[in-house]
Amino acid sequence: QDRHAMSDAALKAGYKEEYLIKTGLCYKRENGELIDRFAGRVIFPWFSLSGKVVGFNGRVLDSRTHGVMQKYVNSPDSEIYHKGNELFGLNQAKQAIRKADSVILVEGQADVISMSQSTVENVVAGSGTALTVNQVRKLHRFTNNITLIYDGDDAGVNAALRNSDLIHGEGMNVSVLFLPDGQDPDDFAKSHTPEELQEFIANNSTDSIIFRINRTLDGVTDPIKR
């Protein structure tokens, strides 16, 4: 694909090369060649709470996904974008979060979009399972209740436990939910009706403290140890 189309158009329109690099839209190779960072990718824009675009996530969606080292590419931190401060979809979801008095945190942008299209609009994403205190505090401005929906593998479970501790430390209530058959929220939302999705979330979310206790006791049959 053309790895210069955006930068060529931007330079022609009068944008300075230094700003294309500072904002992370482009980078320079050792030979001085200016490269479009998101060439050949579907772009998801990250909006600030005030509705301004501050960064991007680029994802390979076609057959090149197989074997591609970087399926996702994110904007690097810049003067206007700090990954540890932003939450994908929060600007669009903040009113729904207030109305529901609850926020659902998922791993990816596609998860947010599919769930929103299935009428679950109080949903946001970080960068995978990474979560920071600043992101939690930003969510706390809109609600005291958060549900984590992560992949059900060991990495997802461990991330849910780790992030639950972080969220509890900020005085919020936390529930966790793992979808069946290794599905992610994007898959589940596409294969179920909006009503089924809402019902599954309502009936299968577990308080994180209870989840931690059950996981600790899993396989322990000695009544004294239990």
For the regions a language model picked out, list residue spans one by one:
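Amphipathic alpha-helical transducer elements in NTP-driven molecular machines
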Residues: 87, 133-136, 140, 156-164, ...
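Hydrophobic alpha-helical scaffolding
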Residues: 79-83, 125, 129, 149-153, ...
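Phosphate/diphosphate-binding loops
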Residues: 154-170, 174, 178
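Active-site-proximal loop/turn and secondary-structure-junction residues that shape catalytic pockets
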Residues: 48, 110, 152-154, 180
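Conserved, well-folded catalytic cores of nucleic-acid-processing
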Residues: 13, 59-60, 142-149, 166-170, ...
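Short secondary-structure boundary/capping segments
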Residues: 119-123, 163-166, 191-194
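Phosphate-handling DNA/RNA-contact segment within nucleic-acid enzymes
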Residues: 3-142, 146, 159-160
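C-terminal or mid-to-C-terminal helical accessory/interaction module adjacent to the motor/catalytic core
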Residues: 171-226
